[in-house]
């Protein structure tokens, strides 16, 4: 594909869904960011293609009145920041205009929260993005997956598929997360939080 270009005067936003590439990870809790990115691509009316200079899967278009580039890194979670950093540099997107969509162990299953900056909560993808951008001050769409019960290792838990009961709710959760992302793009952080955090 031709490299996506942003027309003069457009306000660039970079939305990144975090996950691991490959069919083996497609239905895991850690890949809910990819699931939301896929839904955003549908709303943009286009399909992901490989962006040659960054290596990420990308699609671009307009949502909520703003131009945006939606990306899914094609390397593994703990190295996903490399491709995010490249895209930000290539399209001159500041960290404040980057939105990372990711799973969150510290939120109950299905809860959606928006924030700017903060810690990584043990999330290797967020850690990689922060290292690549040189700052933690990027926006996040946090999607709750809950914590494992008993002594199960959280690192193993996030790489497991959603349970059958959870899977029935995942499409609705992803739709709400995509809606939250559009609100964040269109309204800005605080107004979007006022809407989303009341859900």
Swiss-Prot record:
InterPro entries in alphabetical order: Pept_tRNA_hydro, Pept_tRNA_hydro_CS, Pept_tRNA_hydro_sf
Matching Pfam families: Pept_tRNA_hydro (PF01195)
GO BP annotations, alphabetical order: protein quality control for misfolded or incompletely synthesized proteins; rescue of stalled ribosome
Alphabetically ordered keywords of this record: Cytoplasm, Hydrolase, RNA-binding, tRNA-binding
Active site (catalytic residues): 30
Site (Stabilizes the basic form of H active site to accept a proton): 103
A GO MF term: tRNA binding
Site entry: Discriminates between blocked and unblocked aminoacyl-tRNA: 20
Annotated EC: 3.1.1.29
Binding, tRNA: 25, 76, 78, 124
Reaction it catalyzes: an N-acyl-L-alpha-aminoacyl-tRNA + H2O = an N-acyl-L-amino acid + a tRNA + H(+)
GO cellular component, one term: cytoplasm
Keyword Cytoplasm in annotation: yes
Subcellular compartments: Cytoplasm
EC main group: hydrolase
Record's subunit section: Monomer.
NCBIfam families, per database record: pth
Family designation: Belongs to the PTH family.
Stated role: Hydrolyzes ribosome-free peptidyl-tRNAs (with 1 or more amino acids incorporated), which drop off the ribosome during protein synthesis, or as a result of ribosome stalling.
Protein name: Peptidyl-tRNA hydrolase
Organism name: Mycobacterium leprae (strain TN)
